[in-house]
Amino acid sequence: MFLDQITIELRAGKGGNGVVAWRKEKYLPKGGPYGGNGGVGGSIIIESATHVYSFESYRNIRFLKAEDGRPGATNNRSGKNGKDLVLIVPEGTLLRDVETKEILYDFAKSGERLVVCRGGKGGKGNTFFKTSTNRAPTKATPGKPGEIRQVELELKLIADIGLVGFPNAGKSTLFNTLARTEVKVGAYPFTTLQPVLGLVPCQEKLYQKPWIIADIPGIIEGAHQNRGLGLDFLRHIERTRLLLFVIDICGCERSSPEEDLRILMDELVHYREDLADKNRIIALNKIDDLLPDERQERLESFQKLFPSETFVLVSGLTGEGVDLLNSLFTNKLAV
């Protein structure tokens, strides 16, 4: 499954120690101090990128450490600085300090960088302590420790595709078929109690990155007034690039499938008017319950009532129509 939250301890590198050394040359019996400073410890940097879409590369990692600085050397040579450790995370990553609960940064766009833990400063060699009154210092200092911080990385629900529908519309079954995974499915409302992310392979070979798909918990009429699971999940919808409305083509006792679609659209507009302009596809699901002629009749009814919408007949249970749906994702998103 999609890994969208991790806690990890980050340890910057320790600074290298300064050294005590003396200049030793044939004609300089009292050449004086010649010990170099230690190198700076490596820092830990977090950077966001578009080619990363989960925290999978950090799975089961409890801590990460940057390289220590090297000690100073003779001939007044400074030690080599430790290499910085750069963690690449997806766009939409929220960085939080575990101890203080403070949000350190919101990586909203690709290419953003933040130094999370700074490496320790290098110690001073005895050359540093030479003065007019102390010509032969024997003092050197150790390197400083690097910063240590335990952080939580959370991927905000920034998905390419968001599945929207009433409870029991078959969203989770369709999600499982698209993402080739297994989300809990049941014949009762709100099987999905929190958003679930998955990956849908893109059929366009030139587009290497899979689509991130989100199964949003079922919306009910009045969700914009915080009924049901309410506003928390409507907020997730605004962060998606494409909405996939999932409609039970057979309808339910309460209303017709056409009325279900109208209510869903109204809920989104009541929550935020600009959601009406978001790219969308309407999946008429559970066609396995209908004969071919009945499917076509229902499709024509929808097309007549909603002439500007894109419809596709699918069955999350049998997989019928899923390839066509995937090609529509490519047409809508691979731009």
From Swiss-Prot:
Binding-site residues for Mg(2+), renumbered to this chain: S172, T192
Residue ranges of every copy of the Obg domain listed in the record: 1-158
Obligatory cofactor(s): Mg(2+)
Alphabetical keyword list: Cytoplasm, GTP-binding, Hydrolase, Magnesium, Metal-binding, Nucleotide-binding
Residues binding GTP, per UniProt: 165-172, 190-194, 215-218, 285-288, 315-317
Gene Ontology terms for molecular function: GTP binding; GTPase activity; magnesium ion binding; ribosome binding
Biological process annotations from GO: ribosome biogenesis
Cellular component terms (Gene Ontology): cytoplasm
Span of domain OBG-type G: 159-334
Role this protein plays: An essential GTPase (4.1 pmol GTP/min). Cannot substitute endogenous obg in E.coli, has a partially dominant-negative phenotype upon overexpression in liquid culture leading to decreased growth rate in a concentration-dependent fashion, with 50% of cells being elongated. Binds GTP, GDP and possibly (p)ppGpp with moderate affinity, with high nucleotide exchange rates and a fairly low GTP hydrolysis rate. It may play a role in control of the cell cycle, stress response, ribosome biogenesis and in those bacteria that undergo differentiation, in morphogenesis control.
Record note on quaternary structure: Monomer.
Family: Belongs to the TRAFAC class OBG-HflX-like GTPase superfamily. OBG GTPase family.
UniProt-listed NCBIfam families: Obg_CgtA, PRK12297.1, PRK12299.1
HAMAP family associated with the record: GTPase_Obg
Full protein name: GTPase Obg
